[in-house]
Swiss-Prot record:
Subcellular compartments: Secreted
Native organism: Californiconus californicus (California cone)
Residues annotated as signal peptide: 1-23
Domain of life the protein comes from: Eukaryota
Domain commentary: The cysteine framework is IX (C-C-C-C-C-C).
Tissues in which the protein is found: Expressed by the venom duct.
GO terms, molecular function: toxin activity
Protein name: Conotoxin Cl9.3
Length: 79
């Protein structure tokens, strides 16, 4: 019993100390990292990859793209 407890605690500490996140976890902006070819936004919006982030944000196609990488906001058709 004690062996299992020690092993569990060791695994939890190792996981906590690495600071890694698993695929699919949300970032601060609430959009998951791109894992596959699914479009991350609702219909009618476009996906912007901000210059200071690794995750897409969803915005209206008429919004400014000045903060988007490549100055573009990708539509579902262009995804």
């Amino acid at each position: 019993m004690n062996c299992y407890l020690i092993l569990t605690v060791a695994l939890l500490l190792t996981s906590a100390m690495t600071g890694t996140t698993t695929a699919g976890q949300l970032n601060k902006k609430g959009v998951t990292l791109r894992e596959d070819d699914r479009f991350p936004c609702n219909a009618g919006n476009c996906a912007c990859l901000p210059l200071d982030s690794y995750s897409y944000t969803c915005q209206s196609p008429t919004s400014s793209t000045a903060n988007c990488e490549g100055n573009e906001c990708r539509s579902e058709a262009d995804w």
